[in-house]
């Protein structure tokens, strides 16, 4: 999700002059809060906010992206992976946050820890894809960076 919009604004710093950022958050109460900060930046008119269920919104966006930053509901990470890989341009980059999940994916995962199982499945699925080249960086809670072939 977008939460406060901080990551969105950081990513905007590296955006090309003709680029746009699409950001999705399920919490409509944060929309105005985010928009206030987006509009204060020089990128406000190039940040497009979507409010609602990200899985549904992704289906409605018929665009290709150079970069996708995934930091969403962990229980759906493998579903997100299937939806967003097709939205990446060739040589597009997928950055996924929280892929170490407080180190839980490195230990034995209990049957009732569904979020950890999902993150583990996401990591394994991403690693097995022939159309993606991936590196996992053990920084804080883990970040994976993948390039679409």
Region roles according to the model:
Residues 1-149:
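S-adenosylmethionine/decaboxylated-SAM
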